Amino acid sequence: MAPNLRKSHPLLKMVNSSLIDLPTPSNISSWWNFGSLLGICLMTQILTGLLLAMHYTADTTLAFSSVAHTCRNVQYGWLIRNLHANGASFFFICIYFHIGRGFYYGSYLYKETWNTGVVLLLTLMATAFVGYVLPWGQMSFWGATVITNLFSAIPYIGQTLVEWAWGGFSVDNPTLTRFFALHFLLPFMIAGLTLIHLTFLHESGSNNPLGIVSNCDKIPFHPYFTLKDILGFTLMLLPLTTLALFSPNLLGDPENFTPANPLVTPPHIKPEWYFLFAYAILRSIPNKLGGVLALAASVLILFLIPFLHKAKQRTMTFRPLSQLLFWVLVANLLILTWVGSQPVEHPFIIIGQLASLTYFAILLVLFPIIGTLENKMLNY
């Protein structure tokens, strides 16, 4: 019999073992679709970003007009830009759902996979931040100024570090140039980290909604899950194109239609919606260094999740108390997101402080306690 190239070719057999003949639990739900959706998001963003970079000029005097030129004069430039800007929002929607699914179903017990995933999230956040600066509108400029300024809160080396990052004494041309370089580089780092993430995942195989070993009941990835993933792609690309074509500026800030002006500060400086929860936590602490530490902790806390798992069951499928707490956490994050978009005045200040406190309390205190309580209730 002739050798099967798919299984014998050095490169194809790697693709085969990770995308075609991969043994997959038969009962994984649609919540497991978001990993592949993130892959599609990354490819879309790299492609549209590459096309945008061909028409972009990383110079403070030309950046804003080069983006306007792309939208007005380049064939389908408006579409490429709208897909890229809104694609970032969908990227974050998918990654937040993906993390939520991992949290709900105890996937974080695959520690290496989880930790590389958190590193991927941090890299994605860095990429989105430097990318938002590139159009050089008012919110781009002031967002860059406010966030980079936070590094000055680091004792002793802070101010030097900030000036080194800026390449001067304020956000200016050198800052824009290096942010463009970083925005070009980081997505390829994300692609590399994704391969590491998948390598660790395929060491153990996928988790499933029951959280039990499913080796006795696995099915090949192709055709079952390739088809399911294609359905997922369609269901994601449909709202993305709808948003990009009908209301492309819905999620953007109107302030960014004004070219950057260091002499005029916008009334409300706020980041894109996907950073608002962290921004609300940052603002809820009246001390600069304390706020920076809380901001860092709000994301870095994900590294601690595997160590805070006290329940004897892996998933929350049969743990109603943990489920309740999980949805309280989701509601809490939505409140933080809303508060982050509001001005710093009563009652938003106190709401933000309470929501920030609740966020850390749920993750660090309540989840381990509830897990232990459920063990007692189930006589484990």
Curated annotation (Swiss-Prot):
Gene3D superfamilies: Cytochrome Bc1 Complex, Chain C
Keywords: Electron transport, Heme, Iron, Membrane, Metal-binding, Mitochondrion, Mitochondrion inner membrane, Respiratory chain, Transmembrane, Transmembrane helix, Transport, Ubiquinone
Residues binding heme b b562: 84, 183
Cofactors, names only: heme b
Single GO MF annotation: metal ion binding
GO BP field: mitochondrial electron transport, ubiquinol to cytochrome c
Its membrane topology: Multi-pass membrane protein
InterPro entries: Cyt_b/b6_C, Cyt_b/b6_C_sf, Cyt_b/b6_N, Cytb/b6-like_sf, Cytochrome_b, Cytochrome_b_C_euk/bac, Cytochrome_b_N_euk/bac, Di-haem_cyt_TM
Superkingdom to which the source organism belongs: Eukaryota
Subcellular location(s) of the protein: Mitochondrion inner membrane
Cofactor note: Binds 2 heme b groups non-covalently.
Binding site for heme b b566: 98, 197
Quaternary structure (record): The cytochrome bc1 complex contains 11 subunits: 3 respiratory subunits (MT-CYB, CYC1 and UQCRFS1), 2 core proteins (UQCRC1 and UQCRC2) and 6 low-molecular weight proteins (UQCRH/QCR6, UQCRB/QCR7, UQCRQ/QCR8, UQCR10/QCR9, UQCR11/QCR10 and a cleavage product of UQCRFS1). This cytochrome bc1 complex then forms a dimer.
PANTHER family registered for this protein in UniProt: CYTOCHROME B
Further information: Heme 1 (or BL or b562) is low-potential and absorbs at about 562 nm, and heme 2 (or BH or b566) is high-potential and absorbs at about 566 nm.
Official protein name in the record: Cytochrome b
Organism expressing this protein natively: Halobaena caerulea
Encoding gene (name): MT-CYB
